[in-house]
Every structure is written in structure tokens, then in C-alpha cells.
């Protein structure tokens, strides 16, 4: 080392052999103004032999104004098949008067098949104004995602520490624990894996390293920002149900309940339709049956209406005939001098009639009907009925004649059989009983016919006679 830092020692790069020979670098001392000394780059062997960097055992001293001699670690590369490359820790470095110390960590890469590369971070001593800058190396995992772990580091006086962490190729988690500075400005971006596995970062414990601040320590806690509820105007296709407002969640829940209710109703209708279809198939037959019954009831009602009209007219005629009959009977009961004049005429006598006839006029003001025509018509109807009765009696007599002839024929047959066979007394008794039985049956038949005729005559007298007497 010279007074103005002109003493510079450089080591030529040493290339690793085919199977990874080792190259060692001796310790270098800085100059008064901190002239930098660089170390050679180390390369690993073809099949992953270990390339070892020897540490600088000598404590490096800074210049008068804190221009620290910067020592750069060479880039370490792993072997072809992932043999481990180990980089030893840096020697402890002391800051200058104004703390302008800069230290750079080398970049370390894993092997082809993901062997772990571990880099140790030395403890850094901050300067007076805490301007120490410590960039962390970008750690890359192996081909199959072996984890890379970064050692904790402490910030400077004003906390300008930056930590970067990289994940593995297939997304294995890389964890970084970093200590904040005095004011807690810690940035820790983390990237996910190649196939989307999440990178988990634990909550940082802000343990400030006390600097030149009268021994007081400042702790900064991480602020937790609550989730923002999304209303209907800001909803998107990627919005989760739990991110919505409570009122909107309740409305969606109600809509879902209504949809489920409709689904249950639809299932109930589907279960009801088969049996209901069978019932509907029987409706045409029932309709035809009810139609026939309705038509029959309508025809019956029409017949009843006609019958009622006829009965009403018949009752009216019977009432008129009864009134005339009663009037005629009352007139006949009186002596000859009290008989009403003009009773048997079509109209009641006019002004020339007797006062008695005028006094005996109908109280209701109705005129007398033509009793002669009435009784003449009734007599003609009775004559027709008598002719019917005579015809019926003639038929009965003819039937009785036939019965008598049959009885005589049977009697003759019986006599002939008696004379021819000369049978015993028992046979004659049997024949006589048979003849009497047949005769009795014939008499009963004739009596039935006569009874029917008598009933018909009585019915005509009670109904037809009164019905045709108008």
C-alpha cells in the first residue's frame, strides 16, 4: 500500500480445469485513499468440481476519509451436474469517518439439477451518517426449484436497506427475513415460481439497529389495510362473493333462495304430472257421460214443462166444467118457478129476462157457457166409450166361446177314451179333474179381462169424461 493509493495488486484470472481445479487468492491491503483491489473470477469444473474462494484473512483498513477499498467477490458458477459452489464469507470491514463503505455480494447460481448455493452475508458496520449500501445478490434456484435462503441483514442509520429474493424454477418458496433500518424503509419484492406457486413472505420484524441516535431505538410496525367492500356499481366478473357488501350478499342469498324454491316447485310439478296426465286422460269419458246425463235431464225437464202446461190447462177446464155443473145442479134443485131463464142458452138473458135471473147472475160477472153444447159433446164422448166397451165385451164373448168349445172337445175326448178303454174309476176322476182345472183357468182369464174392462171404464169416467167436457 502506498501513501496515495498507487499500490495496486491484481490477480490474473485463473481458469478452472476440466474437472474443476481450485484457485486461491491472497489478501490485499488498501491504500490511503482506498484504491480498489479486485479478485479473479473463479470457474467451476466441467463435472462440478468444487471451486473454493479463500477468505481474505487480513482486516482491510480504510483511508483517512473513509474511502474503503472495495473488494469484489468473483462470480461463482456451479458445475454441469450441480456440484455445490461455496463462497466463504467476506472479512469484517470497518467504515470510514463518513461511512462511505460499499460492499457488493457476488451472484451465485445453482447447479443444473438444483443443488443449493448458499451465500453468507457478513455483518456490516454503519458509518457516521448511515450511508452504507448493501445490495443483496439475486439468488436463483436450481433447475427443479431447490430453495435459496438469504441470511438476514441489518440496515444503516437511515434504514436504506434493500432486499431482493428470487424463487426457484418450478416455484418453490424463497423466504427472506430482513431487518429494517432506523426509519424502516424496507422493500421486499418477491416473485412467484415458473408454474405459479406462491412465494410466501413472513411479516418483517422491524428490529432497528441503534446507531448514533443517543441510543434510542425506533420500531416500525407493518400497517394492515382492511379489505374494501365492493358495491353493485363496481362489481366485475372476477369479484368474489366475500368481497361484496353485506346488503348485496343478502340480496344475492335471497335470490338464490328464490331460485332454489323455483327448482323445488319444478321438481314437485314434474313428480305430479304423470299421475295428473292419467287423470286428464279420463276426462273425455267423464265429459261424454255428463253430456248424456245433461241431455237426458234437459229432455225430461222439457217434457215436464209440457206436461205441467197441459195439466194447468186441464185444471182450468176442469174448474170451469165443475162450476157449470154445480150451477146446473143448483138450478135443477130449485122448483120450476125458480129456474133461471136462459141458463141453457149461449148467453145470459138480456134486458127482457126476469129480475130473478138478473139477481142470480154470476157474482164474478162471467157469462154462462152453452150447457147444451157441453152436455151434447160429453154425451158423444160417452157414446164412443160405450162402443169401445161393447167391442171389448164382444171379444170376451168370442174368447169364452172358444174356451167353451175347447172344454166340450176335451169332454168328448174324455168320454171316448172312457168308452174305449173302459178304464177304472181313478182314471175318470183324473180326467174330470183335468177338465175342471182347465175350465177354472179359462174362467180366471175371462175374469181378468172383464176386470180390466171395468177398470178402463172407471178411468174413462173419472178422467176422459172430465177432460173432454169443455
UniProtKB/Swiss-Prot annotation:
Record localization: Nucleus, Nuclear pore complex; Nucleus membrane
One annotated GO biological process: protein transport
Segments of skewed composition (Polar residues): 1-13, 32-74, 207-221
Region (Disordered): 1-92, 196-221
Coiled-coil blocks: 239-270, 375-401
Primary localization class, coarse: nucleus
Skewed-composition ranges (Low complexity): 20-31, 75-92, 197-206
Topological relation to the membrane, as annotated: Peripheral membrane protein
GO cellular component, one term: nuclear membrane
Pfam families: Nucleoporin_FG (PF13634), Nup49_C (PF21121)
GLFG repeat segments: 17-20, 45-48, 63-66, 79-82, 96-99, 111-114, 127-130, 142-145, 156-159, 168-171, 181-184, 193-197
Keywords: Coiled coil, Membrane, mRNA transport, Nuclear pore complex, Nucleus, Protein transport, Repeat, Translocation, Transport
GO molecular function: nuclear localization sequence binding; structural constituent of nuclear pore
Subunit structure: Component of the nuclear pore complex (NPC). NPC constitutes the exclusive means of nucleocytoplasmic transport. NPCs allow the passive diffusion of ions and small molecules and the active, nuclear transport receptor-mediated bidirectional transport of macromolecules such as proteins, RNAs, ribonucleoparticles (RNPs), and ribosomal subunits across the nuclear envelope. Due to its 8-fold rotational symmetry, all subunits are present with 8 copies or multiples thereof.
Family to which this protein belongs: Belongs to the nucleoporin GLFG family.
Annotated domain remarks: Contains FG repeats. FG repeats are interaction sites for karyopherins (importins, exportins) and form probably an affinity gradient, guiding the transport proteins unidirectionally with their cargo through the NPC. FG repeat regions are highly flexible and lack ordered secondary structure. The overall conservation of FG repeats regarding exact sequence, spacing, and repeat unit length is limited.
PANTHER family: NUCLEOPORIN P58/P45 NUCLEOPORIN-LIKE PROTEIN 1, NUCLEOPORIN P58_P45
Designated name of the protein: Nucleoporin NUP49
Biological classification of the source: Eukaryota, Fungi, Dikarya, Ascomycota, Pezizomycotina
Gene: NUP49
Amino acid at each position: 500500500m502506498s501513501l496515495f493509493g498507487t499500490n495496486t495488486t491484481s490477480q490474473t484470472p485463473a481458469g478452472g480445469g476440466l474437472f474443476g481445479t481450485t484457485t486461491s487468492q491472497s489478501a490485499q491491503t488498501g491504500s490511503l485513499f482506498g484504491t480498489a483491489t479486485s479478485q479473479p473470477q473463479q470457474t467451476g469444473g466441467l463435472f462440478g468440481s468444487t471451486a473454493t474462494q479463500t477468505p481474505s484473512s487480513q482486516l482491510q483498513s480504510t483511508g483517512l476519509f473513509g474511502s474503503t477499498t472495495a473488494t469484489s467477490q468473483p462470480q461463482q458458477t456451479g458445475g454441469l451436474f450441480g456440484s455445490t459452489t461455496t463462497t466463504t464469507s467476506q472479512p469484517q470491514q470497518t467504515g470510514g469517518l463518513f461511512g462511505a463503505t460499499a460492499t457488493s455480494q457476488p451472484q451465485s447460481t445453482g447447479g443444473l439439477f438444483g443443488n443449493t448455493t448458499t451465500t453468507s452475508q457478513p455483518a456490516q458496520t454503519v458509518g457516521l451518517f448511515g450511508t452504507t449500501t448493501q445490495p443483496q445478490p439475486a439468488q436463483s434456484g436450481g433447475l427443479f426449484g431447490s430453495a435459496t435462503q438469504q441470511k438476514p441483514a441489518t440496515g444503516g442509520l437511515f434504514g436504506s436497506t434493500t432486499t431482493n429474493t428470487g424463487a426457484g424454477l418450478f416455484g418453490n418458496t424463497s423466504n427472506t427475513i430482513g431487518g429494517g433500518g432506523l426509519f424502516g424503509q424496507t422493500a421486499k419484492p418477491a416473485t412467484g415460481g415458473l408454474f405459479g406457486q406462491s412465494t410466501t413472505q413472513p411479516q418483517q420484524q422491524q428490529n432497528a439497529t441503534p446507531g448514533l441516535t443517543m441510543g434510542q431505538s425506533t420500531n416500525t410496525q407493518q400497517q394492515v389495510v382492511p379489505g374494501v367492500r365492493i358495491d353493485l356499481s363496481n362489481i366485475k366478473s372476477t369479484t368474489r362473493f366475500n368481497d361484496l357488501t353485506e346488503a348485496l350478499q343478502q340480496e344475492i342469498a335471497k335470490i338464490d333462495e328464490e331460485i332454489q324454491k323455483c327448482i323445488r316447485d319444478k321438481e314437485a310439478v314434474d313428480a305430479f304430472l304423470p299421475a295428473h296426465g292419467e287423470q286428464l286422460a279420463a276426462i273425455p269419458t267423464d265429459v261424454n257421460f255428463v253430456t248424456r246425463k245433461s241431455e237426458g235431464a234437459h229432455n225430461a225437464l222439457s217434457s215436464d214443462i209440457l206436461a205441467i202446461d197441459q195439466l194447468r190447462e186441464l185444471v182450468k177446464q176442469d174448474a170451469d166444467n165443475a162450476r157449470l155443473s154445480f150451477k146446473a145442479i143448483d138450478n135443477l134443485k130449485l122448483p120450476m118457478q125458480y129456474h133461471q131463464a136462459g141458463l141453457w142458452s149461449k148467453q145470459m138473458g138480456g134486458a127482457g129476462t126476469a129480475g130473478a135471473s138478473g139477481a142470480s147472475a154470476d157474482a164474478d160477472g162471467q157469462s154462462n157457457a152453452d150447457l147444451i153444447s157441453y152436455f151434447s159433446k160429453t154425451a158423444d164422448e160417452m157414446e164412443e166409450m160405450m162402443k169401445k166397451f161393447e167391442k171389448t165385451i164382444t171379444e170376451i164373448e168370442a174368447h169364452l166361446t172358444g174356451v167353451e168349445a175347447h172344454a166340450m172337445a176335451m169332454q168328448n175326448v174324455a168320454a171316448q177314451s172312457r168308452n174305449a178303454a173302459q178304464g177304472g174309476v181313478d182314471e175318470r176322476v183324473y180326467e174330470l179333474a183335468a177338465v175342471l182345472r182347465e175350465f177354472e183357468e179359462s174362467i180366471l182369464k175371462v175374469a181378468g179381462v172383464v176386470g180390466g174392462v171395468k177398470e178402463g171404464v172407471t178411468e174413462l169416467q173419472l178422467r176422459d169424461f172430465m177432460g173432454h167436457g169443455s
